[in-house]
């Protein structure tokens, strides 16, 4: 690393420290961004290894497919898209470091990722400080795009937020499944899961028979599940990631618990079925922003065909959201000279049609779009239906 770059990086981290200590009134005050050169440089800050690599790898596939398509069609304003990829290893601290490297050393014009909320939260301050917009395909934590001062100028998302998922789970379980009594079992070590659980508790009209928690990394859930088995309830609502919920589903079915299991978009990966087992992954419902069973736009069938040709498998929600994210950045890059221009254009994006549906970015940088409830039987998605909820 050259002396000049070293000084820039040291100054950047010093400013981060001052912000953390409350010394800076506005972290975006000097966020001048990066200039767009001969190519439009898109940084990819993604969980390619580690605990939730399944999300990151699917999103990387969607990103690459979109970039290839756009470049083959001539790029944006005659400029090709160039990817610079960093593996954040499913670690929040590494996500921050990756964004710093992408923004300061690689001088990217926009960043796609990370995939998970904790990693996005860690990386978002870098975007706020440098003026390089971050668009997370799947980070759902409510406060990722806002803080005490209002909307974060350089942070956006393609998916819906946690509180919306909690509302969808509450409405669908009560109205569609007629589940008037539920067990609420969630990951207390995850802000993502806690946020969904909190909103579910606020919105659910039925009775929560019992509320229990587990922690990320746990492997044995027999004690809690044994207690649930003899209770009177209609469904289990289980906010968390597939890494734990897939195992819990297997252990629940092995104990003879056959009640419907409902969860958030953290269930939306084939790894869930691998962990649960195909037979056990039945009567399972989860929130999703995309399903191959429902065409949310005219672009859906073409995307599925192209994805299967490229990767020999169907795309999941994470791949679709990441694919849309690249096209959103491409749209926002039209006539842009800097990364700040891209951020400004993303904030004004209206009626954008992607494979996950038509969306408009609202004042808090969240998309206004449809949500789905997907049903899984024998490890396969068998149905998907739209759920209308007031945001």
Stretch-by-stretch model annotation:
Residues 127, 196-287:
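Extracellular/periplasmic bilobed ligand-binding domains
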Residues 48, 152-213, 235:
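An alpha-beta-alpha
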Residues 310-319, 330-381:
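Segments of small-molecule ligand-sensing domains
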Residues 26-31, 55-58, 73-146, 214-218, ...:
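Beta-alpha junction/loop-to-helix N-cap segments that form part of ligand/metal-binding clefts
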Residues 30-62, 86-93, 115-116, 185-194, ...:
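Extracytoplasmic "Venus flytrap"
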Residues 95, 157-181, 194, 220-222, ...:
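Hydrophobic alpha-helical segments within soluble ligand-binding/sensing domains
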């Amino acid at each position: 690393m050259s002396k000049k770059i070293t000084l820039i990086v040291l100054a950047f981290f010093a400013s981060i420290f001052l912000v953390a200590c409350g010394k800076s009134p506005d972290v975006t005050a000097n966020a001048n961004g990066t200039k767009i050169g001969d190519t439009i440089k898109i940084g990819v800050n993604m969980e390619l290894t580690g605990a939730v690599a399944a999300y990151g790898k699917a999103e990387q596939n969607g990103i690459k497919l979109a970039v290839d398509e756009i470049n083959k069609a001539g790029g944006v304003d005659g400029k090709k898209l160039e990817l610079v990829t960093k593996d954040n290893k499913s670690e929040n601290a590494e996500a921050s470091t990756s964004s710093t490297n992408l923004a300061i050393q690689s001088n990217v014009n926009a960043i796609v990722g990370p995939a998970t909320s904790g990693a996005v939260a860690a990386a978002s301050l870098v975007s706020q400080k440098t003026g390089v917009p971050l668009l997370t395909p799947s980070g759902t934590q409510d406060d990722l795009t806002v803080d005490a001062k209002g909307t974060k100028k350089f942070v956006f998302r393609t998916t819906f937020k946690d509180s919306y998922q909690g509302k969808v789970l509450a409405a669908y379980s009560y109205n569609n499944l007629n589940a008037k009594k539920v067990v609420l079992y969630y990951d207390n070590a995850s802000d993502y899961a806690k946020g969904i659980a909190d909103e579910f508790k606020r919105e659910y009209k039925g009775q929560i028979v019992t509320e229990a928690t587990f922690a990320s990394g746990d492997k044995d859930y027999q004690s809690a599940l044994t207690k649930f088995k003899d209770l009177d309830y209609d469904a289990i609502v289980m906010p968390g990631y597939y890494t734990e919920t897939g195992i819990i589903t297997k252990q629940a079915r092995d104990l003879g618990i056959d009640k419907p299991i409902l969860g958030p978009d953290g269930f939306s990966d084939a790894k869930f079925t691998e962990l649960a087992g195909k037979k056990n992954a039945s009567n399972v419902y989860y929130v999703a922003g995309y399903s191959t069973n429902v065409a949310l736009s005219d672009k859906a069938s073409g995307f599925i065909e192209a994805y299967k040709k490229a990767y020999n498998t169907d795309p999941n929600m994470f791949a679709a959201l990441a694919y849309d994210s690249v096209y959103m950045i491409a749209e926002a890059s039209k006539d842009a000279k800097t990364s700040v221009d891209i951020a400004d254009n993303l904030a004004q994006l209206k009626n954008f049609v992607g494979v996950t549906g038509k969306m408009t970015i609202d004042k808090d940088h969240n998309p206004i779009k449809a949500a789905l409830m997907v049903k899984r039987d024998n490890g396969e998605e068998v149905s998907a239906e739209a759920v209308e909820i007031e945001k």
